[in-house]
Curated annotation (Swiss-Prot):
This is Putative uncharacterized protein YWHAH-AS1. Keywords: Membrane, Transmembrane, Transmembrane helix. GO terms for cellular component: membrane. It comes from Homo sapiens (Human). It is a single-pass membrane protein. It comes from the Eukaryota.
Length: 160
């Protein structure tokens, strides 16, 4: 799949998997930097009673506008901020900032210690990307797409 380069030369490929087991999702984000080679972030998403947890492992150096070049520590974990306070504090050491979107708790933005803006894919985004309509084998759906990487993921996705 082809894309147009943005001013940074950084592109993001997102792959979503929705497994047959209720609440199980995996998200892989791949970043390709023109002239610098690939960098990959893997997300493991677990849905909890009161929210969701996300574990992130990244490889390679990912340059980001306004932040220079940084390497994400591995692994990192976030708990969505609408969980209980004591659980938020438990994960405060691995995430410098996490907040819900203004209109919905379905989309969260997390900022890693290396100042890389990471989109936490949730069910809202999965539905918007059509992954549930793209079943390729029983119990599993998969959707991959390339987008220009931008500092604010909310500029890319709109809530339905």
């Amino acid at each position: 799949m082809t894309t147009q380069e943005d001013t940074t030369g950084l592109h993001q490929k997102t792959s979503l998997w929705t497994m047959s087991r209720p609440g199980a999702k995996k998200v892989m984000n791949s970043y390709f930097i023109a002239g610098c080679g690939p960098a990959v972030c893997y997300y493991a998403v677990s849905w909890l009673r009161q929210g969701f947890s996300i574990n992130l492992t990244s490889f390679g150096r990912i340059p980001w506008p306004h932040a220079g070049v940084g390497t994400c520590p591995s692994p990192q974990s976030w708990i969505s901020p609408f969980l209980q306070s004591h659980r938020e504090h438990h994960y405060a050491k691995t995430s410098s900032h996490s907040q819900p979107s203004p209109q919905s708790l379905a989309l969260c933005l997390a900022y890693s210690r290396c100042s890389i803006n990471i989109c936490q894919m949730t069910e809202c985004i999965s539905l918007a990307s059509g992954c549930h309509q793209a079943l390729r084998e029983p119990g599993r759906s998969e959707e991959s797409f390339w987008i220009p990487a931008t500092p604010y993921i909310s500029n890319i996705f709109s809530e339905s």
